[in-house]
Amino acid sequence: MTVDYKNTLNLPETSFPMRGDLAKREPDMLKNWYEKNLYQKIRKASKGKKSFILHDGPPYANGNIHIGHAVNKILKDIIIKSKTALGFDSPYIPGWDCHGLPIELKVEGLVGKPNEKISAAEFRQKCREYASEQVEGQKKDFIRLGVLGDWDNPYLTMNFDTEANIIRTLGKVIENGHLYKGSKPVHWCLDCGSSLAEAEVEYEDKVSPSIYVRFPAESAVEIEAKFSAQGRGQGKLSAIIWTTTPWTMPSNRAIAVNADLEYNLVQLGDERVILAAELVESVAKAVGVEQVEILGSVKGADLELSRFHHPFYDFTVPVILGDHVTTDGGTGLVHTAPDHGLDDFIVGKQYDLPMAGLVSNDGKFISTTEFFAGKGVFEANPLVIEKLQEVGNLLKVEKIKHSYPHCWRHKTPIIFRATPQWFIGMETQGLRQQALGEIKQVRWIPDWGQARIEKMVENRPDWCISRQRTWGVPMTLFVHKETEELHPRTLELLEEVAKRVERAGIQAWWDLDEKELLGADAETYRKVPDTLDVWFDSGSTYSSVVANRLEFNGQDIDMYLEGSDQHRGWFMSSLMLSTATNSKAPYKQVLTHGFTVDGQGRKMSKSIGNIVTPQEVMDKFGGDILRLWVASTDYTGEMTVSDEILKRAADSYRRIRNTARFLLANLNGFDPKRDLVKPEEMISLDRWAVACALDAQNEIKDAYDNYQFHTVVQRLMRFCSVEMGSFYLDIIKDRQYTTKADSLARRSCQTALWHIAEALVRWMAPILSFTADEIWQHLPQTESARAEFVFTEEFYQGLFGLGEDEKLDDAYWQQLIKVRSEVNRVLEISRNNKEIGGGLEAEVTVYANDEYRALLAQLGNELRFVLITSKVDVKSLSEKPADLADSELEGIAVSVTRSNAEKCPRCWHYSDEIGVSPGHPTLCARCVENVVGNGEVRYFA
C-alpha cells in the first residue's frame, strides 16, 4: 500500500487571493478606509514629526476628470504617502478653483445671462451651486484613485473664508506698492468680452490676410534729401509696412524703424519705396518685381520724425525708433497702433502717441470710426483691404498661415486691445528682478523648469489682474469718481469688506451700499465693478489657504506639483503674488510632469478617438494598475498610455502580487512572537536575503526621496523577480516544504520571509495602495498590536545587513548566482533535448578552477539545494572531458546526466538512499529524518 506523505509537508497556504480582482475589491477597501477615518489616523500617527507640505494646485471645478488629472493626483498621493513612510507629517488638503468664465458659460447655458432673465445675485448663486456639483463629481473620481486626503474639508476658492483671504492678499499687493491702473493693450477675447491672462492664451495656426501697405511721404523732397537721392528715381515715394492684421490700420499712429538698421530708398517698378536694406530682395520677390535700383541709404535714426500720410485717413504719422523692429520678416518698417500691440504701446508712450480707442468691448468699431463704424474687427479685414485698393495704397495682398493667439476656452482668435485695467507692475518695487532672484532659491524638478520660468518672467508683461465678469472675487476697491485715485483708507476698507465676505461670501460686496463704509465720501467715490483674474484666486492660495489652515501649523510650503503648462500658469501667478506680498517664493520645490499621449505619441483627442479615461481604466484594470502605470512612467517627458501599455503594467503587477502571495503563503503557521529566529542563528542564505532587502530598501527610500518613482518600480521588480523570484524563493521551497515544521531550518527561512514581507508591503504602499492594504491585513501579528493600516507606518526598521565577519558575504552569493545561472543554462539545453525533465532528475558535475572550487566547497552537500538538483559533484577544471562544451562563465564547465537513482515521492529528489528505513521504504534518508527523526540540519541554504 502506498503511503501519502502529503500531510507531513509544510505546504503553502493563504487566504490572500491569487487574482487581484482590483476593479471589484477596491471600492470595498475605500469604504473601509473612510468608515474608519484612515486619513485622520495618519494625521494622529504623524503628529509632532517634521512637516512636509505639498500644496494642491486646484483643478477647475468643471467637467469630469481626465487622465491628466489622474496622473497629477496619483503623483501627489505617492509623494504624500512616501513622505509619511519616510517619517514626515505630510497633510494633504485637496482644492478646487471655483470662479471664472467656464462656469459662467455653463450657467448661462442653463439660466441665461445675468441681468437678462436672472439677476446678477441669483446668477452668482447658480454658479456657486454648479461649482459645488462639479466638485462632488470630481471628488468621487479622485477618491476612487486611492488618493488619501481631507476630502471632507477641501479648500474651495469660493469658500467664504478663502474669498475673504483673497481680498486680503490684494490688500498686501496694494500695501507694497505693486498695483496700478492703466490703459494698455491686453489680450482681449471677443467671446468672453473680457481681458485674458497670459496663461489663458494658446497659440494655434490661423490663415490671415498678409498685406504690404504704402504710407505716402508728406514731403518727397525732404525724404530724397535724407537719402541724398535728389533727382534720382521716379514715381511717388512711400514707406512700406507689412501686417497680418488689416483691421488695426484705422488705429495706426506711427511707423517704427530700428535706429541702427540700414534703410534703402529703392526704385521698385514705377515707384520709390523705403525698405530695410536686408529685406529689399525678399519684398521685391513678394510683390513680383524682378529688378530694383538702390537710390540711397541711411540709418534708421536719420528717418526719425519724418512724416508720412496715413494710407486712408486725412492725417500724417511720424517715423519713430523702436528696438523691437527687426529684419526677421516684413519690410523693416513696422505699422504702429498703440491700442493693439504691447511693443506699439511701449514705444508709443515714449513719443506721446495718442491712443485711438476705436474698438469697443464687443470687438466692434465705435460709431465715429470713419469707413468701418459698427463692423467687427475680423469682419473689417476685407473692408480695409478694399479701402486700401480704392485709394491706391495697397502694394500687395495674399494669404498667410501663421501662429496666432487664441482663447484657451473658446478656441477663437483674440485681439490686443487697450482698455483701462488694473495691473501688477513687473518693474514697480523691483518685482521682476526679485522674482528672478527667488527662482534661483527653488529646486526645480526636472531642472530645466528653472530656465523655462526664468525666461517667462524675464519677458512677461505687467499682470492685468482685472476682469469684467460676474462670477469672481470682486476687486473691492473704491476710486474717486473724477480722478480714479484709490480711496486714502483703501487698506482699512479692504479689511472691512473682507470681514463681510467672510460671513456672507462675495455677494456681500455687490450688496454693499457705499455709504455704509464711506459715509460722506460716498458722494465722491464709487465701487470698482471689476472682478479678479482667477489666476489671482489660485495664485494666492499660499496665503489664503495654507497660511490660514490649522493643519499646516504656519509651516512654509515644500512643494508645488503640476503639469508643465503651469510654469506660465499657477507656478507663475503664485510666484508673483508671494514675491509681491512676502518677498519670497511660495514654494521650496516645484515638480512638473508631462502630458499624456497615446501609444503613437499623439495628444488625446475626441476627433481622433484616442481618449483614455481614468474611469475606463479603473473599471477594466483597477486603480492600482493605473497607479503602477503612473509610477512606472518617467513623468519628466510625455507620458504614453494605451491599452497595450496598461496590460504590461498589469503583467508587472501580477509578478509583484505573486511574490507577496508566496511570502504570505509560506508564513502560514508562523507566529513572530514565538517563532522569530535571531539574526546570528539564521541560516546564511536567509541572512543574505534580509540583507538584500535592506539594500533594496535603501535604494527605494532614496528614490522616493528624490521623486524617482520609475526607479522605485524598477527596483521593486528587480527585487521580486530577480533577487527573490529567480533565486532565493526558488531555492527555499525545498527547505520550507520538507523540513520539520518547527525546525530551525524552516523557522529561519520564515523569519527572513517575514522581515521581507514587512518591508515589501511598505515599499509598495505609496504606489500599489490597495494591494498593500490587502497584504497588510494578511500579515502575521507582531508582539505589539499591528497598526490597523500600513499607511500610518514608516519604512520597516527590522531589516539588517551582513556582519563584517560573515563568511558567506554578498560577494560570495553574487558569485554563486553566476554559477547557478550557468548550471541552469546547461540544464535548459538538456531539457530541450529531452535528456531530463526537471532539474531534480539531473546529476550535475561542475568542473571548476581553484577559485570556484573553493567557493563551491564552502556549501558542502547543500550546494545541490542552491542549484536545485538531486546531486552535484565538483571537480577540477583540468578533469574536464575534451568533448564538453565551453561554459559561458570563465573558470567553470558544466555537464548534466540523467539520474539513475530512485525518486523520493515526498521531496521529489532522486536518491541512492531510498529504502534505508524499513518503516518508510519509499522515502529518502533525508525525508525519514524530517518525518520521524529530529529533522535535517541546514547551515548555509
Swiss-Prot record:
**Keywords for the protein's UniProt record, in alphabetical order:** Aminoacyl-tRNA synthetase, ATP-binding, Cytoplasm, Ligase, Metal-binding, Nucleotide-binding, Protein biosynthesis, Zinc
Motif 'HIGH' region, chain ranges: 59-69
Recorded E.C. number(s)?
Answer: 6.1.1.5
Q: Report the GO terms under cellular component.
A: cytosol
Chain's role = Catalyzes the attachment of isoleucine to tRNA(Ile). As IleRS can inadvertently accommodate and process structurally similar amino acids such as valine, to avoid such errors it has two additional distinct tRNA(Ile)-dependent editing activities. One activity is designated as 'pretransfer' editing and involves the hydrolysis of activated Val-AMP. The other activity is designated 'posttransfer' editing and involves deacylation of mischarged Val-tRNA(Ile).
Instruction: Look up the domain of life of the source.
Output: Bacteria
Q: Which cysteines link up through disulfide bonds?
A: none
Note on how the cofactor is bound:
Binds 1 zinc ion per subunit.
Q: Which organism is it from?
A: Haemophilus influenzae (strain 86-028NP)
- Show the GO MF annotations: aminoacyl-tRNA deacylase activity; ATP binding; isoleucine-tRNA ligase activity; tRNA binding; zinc ion binding
Which family, according to the similarity comment?
Answer: Belongs to the class-I aminoacyl-tRNA synthetase family. IleS type 1 subfamily.
Cofactor(s) this protein requires: Zn(2+)
InterPro entries in the record, alphabetically?
A: aa-tRNA-synth_I_CS, aa-tRNA-synth_Ia, Anticodon_Ile_BEm, Ile-tRNA-ligase, Ile-tRNA-ligase_type1, Ile-tRNA_ligase, M/V/L/I-tRNA-synth_anticd-bd, Rossmann-like_a/b/a_fold
By its UniProt entry, which Pfam families does this protein fall under?
Anticodon_1, tRNA-synt_1, zf-FPG_IleRS
List positions binding ATP.
606
- Where is this protein chiefly located? cytoplasm
Protein's name according to its UniProt entry? Isoleucine--tRNA ligase
Entry text on domains: IleRS has two distinct active sites: one for aminoacylation and one for editing. The misactivated valine is translocated from the active site to the editing site, which sterically excludes the correctly activated isoleucine. The single editing site contains two valyl binding pockets, one specific for each substrate (Val-AMP or Val-tRNA(Ile)).
| UniProt binding sites for L-isoleucyl-5'-AMP | 562
> Where would I look for the motif 'KMSKS' region in this sequence?
603-607
Subcellular localization, per the record?
Answer: Cytoplasm
Q: Which reaction does it catalyse?
A: tRNA(Ile) + L-isoleucine + ATP = L-isoleucyl-tRNA(Ile) + AMP + diphosphate
The entry describes its oligomerization and partners as:
Monomer.
UniProt lineage = Bacteria, Pseudomonadati, Pseudomonadota, Gammaproteobacteria, Pasteurellales
List positions binding Zn(2+).
904, 907, 924, 927
The GO annotation for biological process reads:
isoleucyl-tRNA aminoacylation
